Curated annotation (Swiss-Prot):
It is a multi-pass membrane protein. Disulfide bonds join 184-191, 282-287. G-protein coupled receptor for the bioactive lysosphingolipid sphingosine 1-phosphate (S1P) that seems to be coupled to the G(i) subclass of heteromeric G proteins. Signaling leads to the activation of RAC1, SRC, PTK2/FAK1 and MAP kinases. Plays an important role in cell migration, probably via its role in the reorganization of the actin cytoskeleton and the formation of lamellipodia in response to stimuli that increase the activity of the sphingosine kinase SPHK1. Required for normal chemotaxis toward sphingosine 1-phosphate. The modification N6-acetyllysine is found at residue 10. This is Sphingosine 1-phosphate receptor 1. It comes from Mus musculus (Mouse). Palmitoylated by ZDHHC5. Palmitoylation is required for targeting to plasma membrane, enabling G(i) coupling. The modification Phosphothreonine is found at residue 236. InterPro entries: EDG1, GPCR_Rhodpsn, GPCR_Rhodpsn_7TM, S1P_rcpt. GO terms for molecular function: G protein-coupled receptor binding; sphingolipid binding; sphingosine-1-phosphate receptor activity. The chain crosses the membrane at residues 47-68, 83-104, 117-138, 161-182, 197-224, 258-278, 290-310. Residues 69-82, 139-160, 225-257, 311-382 are cytoplasmic. The gene is S1pr1. Interacts with GNAI1 and GNAI3. Interacts with CD69; this interaction promotes S1PR1 degradation. The modification Phosphoserine is found at residues 351, 353.
């Protein structure tokens, strides 16, 4: 019993000590052929890195304003907007993580311990994973809303927080797997070229997970569009011409929205997925395209910059609130603050009070789930 446990203890100590060994980074980068490429960066940050950092700064600023817009506007304190806020937070963190990644790259890489390297890369995985899982959570929430044809039920908030919590827990686990042991520190032949301390099986696993997420998002949005089309046909069958016409317009708007959402997501992420699959299949130093991974990664990060535009600024009410927040930041005076406290849309408070006192509040078009699904993805439910 003792004889079998001693080697295990030695192996554990060796594994733990490897996380603080600076030579491991050099050894793995040399094996994958990235050592000479990294040496070219000794003289400072490359121009492309500066451009990427500027893009990240824009992404960070953009998502900060989205969070401020949701926080400052009480009518956006609703379950659907919690998902938009969570998406903005994950996109903001993706911008921060990639900026830190760029600043700690190049010659600085060889000054990192494996543990620090895992934290540098793992933070990127966590932020980008949270962003993708947030997109899935938004699609799930919209699909459930369309099925129930209700926006205001008691379970919405708890379901929202449950989905948001699941996004972050799964993302943290996914990003933390390498530092917890799923790496190639003790197996050079299994190392990724793009990420030299990551095991190829882990890269394949992550690519598979993200591909399944993409397919799930595609299926959910197609189902949402199908539900809206079915409702439109029912109205036509009942010869309710005015409602059928409005529903058809919403269906068309929803179709455009779905195409934009899925096209942008695929355009940003598909190149990186393909690159990672090549990474799994190629032997070390055989695929030159793998040494250009930063261009594929920044494209995925760009998705964090397009999300606020697609999910926030295409909504008229959120766009007006967003512009008002930006205006307040540009002109921080008493008048601006006073203006912000007024209704975002003239007459909104008056019309809402009448609706609240009405015996049929559901007939307000703003409460129609179809409105939320069309016209810029998310419209106010009030």
């Amino acid at each position: 019993m003792v004889s079998t446990s001693i080697p295990e203890v030695k192996a554990l100590r060796s594994s733990v000590s490897d996380y603080g060994n600076y030579d491991i980074i050099v050894r793995h980068y040399n094996y994958t052929g990235k050592l000479n490429i990294g040496a070219e960066k000794d003289h400072g940050i490359k121009l492309t890195s500066v451009v990427f950092i500027l893009i990240c700064c824009f992404i960070i600023l953009e998502n900060i304003f989205v969070l401020l817009t949701i926080w400052k506007t009480k009518k956006f304190h609703r379950p659907m907007y919690y998902f938009i806020g969570n998406l903005a937070l994950s996109d903001l963190l993706a911008g921060v993580a990639y900026t830190a990644n760029l600043l700690l790259s190049g010659a600085t890489t060889y000054k990192l311990t494996p543990a620090q390297w895992f934290l540098r890369e793992g933070s990127m995985f966590v932020a980008l994973s949270a962003s993708v899982f947030s997109l899935l959570a938004i699609a799930i929430e919209r699909y459930i809303t369309m099925l129930k044809m209700k926006l205001h039920n008691g379970s919405n908030s708890s379901r929202s927080f449950l989905l948001i919590s699941a996004c972050w827990v799964i993302s943290l686990i996914l990003g933390g797997l390498p530092i917890m042991g799923w790496n190639c520190i003790s197996s050079l032949s299994s190392c990724s070229t793009v990420l030299p301390l990551y095991h190829k099986h882990y890269i394949l696993f992550c690519t598979t997970v993200f591909t399944l997420l993409l397919l799930s998002i595609v299926i959910l949005y197609c189902r949402i569009y199908s539900l809206v089309r079915t409702r439109s046909r029912r109205l036509t069958f009942r010869k309710n011409i005015s409602k059928a016409s409005r529903s058809s317009e919403k269906s068309l708007a929803l179709l455009k929205t779905v195409i934009i959402v899925l096209s942008v997501f695929i355009a940003c992420w598909a190149p990186l997925f393909i690159l990672l699959l090549l990474d799994v299949g190629c032997k070390a130093k055989t695929c030159d395209i793998l040494y250009k991974a930063e261009y594929f990664l920044v494209l995925a990060v760009l998705n964090s910059g397009t999300n606020p535009i697609i999910y926030t600024l295409t909504n008229k009410e959120m766009r007006r609130a967003f512009i008002r927040i930006v205006s307040c930041c540009k002109c921080p005076n008493g008048d601006s603050a006073g203006k912000f406290k007024r209704p975002i849309i003239p007459g909104m408070e008056f019309s809402r009070s009448k609706s609240d006192n009405s015996s049929h509040p559901q007939k307000d078009d703003g409460d129609n789930p179809e409105t939320i699904m069309s016209s810029g993805n998310v419209n106010s439910s009030s």
